[in-house]
Design a protein with these regions (language model features):
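Phosphate/nucleotide-binding beta-alpha loop and adjacent structural elements of enzyme active sites
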Residues: 1-214
């Protein structure tokens, strides 16, 4: 769980996805028993099936997509994206897991999968109609081959009435704005159409994400 959510952890049920069994086992004890949190041993994608995960020199740069040396050339961070190994993993669509009763419908989504965010969010399908907020890593330049960029996320989420509210720069590219955290919430102009159950959840995410007054 992100540090900013920890003060509110008693109001959050975290559903984490980790395709590596050893890493999933490490994560489970970090979820308090009372939270009903889950660690699901799957990757997420637009199409279910077997995928190759490119393990990068720096684990945080690992991706289902191959990095693009041409785009990364000239940045000191470039060597961290170099692939050092590859492993096969199974990926599923989130909406299929939900249909099978294995995960609850999401209220808020946090996705940071190194260039594969668009495909993961597509796999939520019509469940996005019930989502009140999304925090996604997003990109202005294609650091990974074939990746979608921020404007693609905006276009994907607009039909679900999820609108871009804020971006914050992700450091690492020596002053260039290459990667950001993008925050989307339901409704235009900060005036979402919410159910009574959603209203306190929306108020909480506004506070945690620092969107009050924006």
């Amino acid at each position: 769980m992100q540090q900013k959510w920890k003060p509110h952890r008693r109001r959050v049920r975290a559903i984490l996805f980790e395709p590596n069994p050893a890493e999933a086992a490490r994560l489970r004890p970090t979820l308090p028993a009372w939270s009903e949190g889950l660690v699901v041993e799957h990757g997420l994608a637009e199409v279910a099936g077997a995928y190759t995960l490119n393990l990068a020199h720096w684990p945080g740069c690992t991706s289902l997509l191959a990095s693009d040396p041409g785009v990364l050339a000239g940045y000191k961070i470039a060597p961290l994206y170099e692939t050092v190994d590859r492993v096969n993993i199974e990926c599923v669509r989130f909406d299929e897991l939900h249909k099978a009763g294995k995960v609850p419908a999401p209220d808020v989504i946090k996705v940071d999968v190194e260039g594969y965010e668009h495909q993961v969010l597509t796999g939520f399908g019509d469940l996005l109609h019930g989502v009140i907020g999304i925090e996604a890593e997003a990109w202005f330049y294609p650091v990974f081959k074939g990746q979608k960029l921020l404007h693609d996320l905006v276009a994907l989420l607009a039909p679900f009435s999820l609108h871009l509210r804020r971006i914050e720069a992700v450091p690492g590219f020596e002053g260039d704005l290459v990667c950001v955290n993008a925050y989307f919430t339901r409704g235009k102009a900060g005036h979402p159409d919410l159910t009574l159950e959603q209203q306190p959840k929306y108020a909480l995410l506004q506070r945690v994400w620092g969107l009050n007054g924006i």
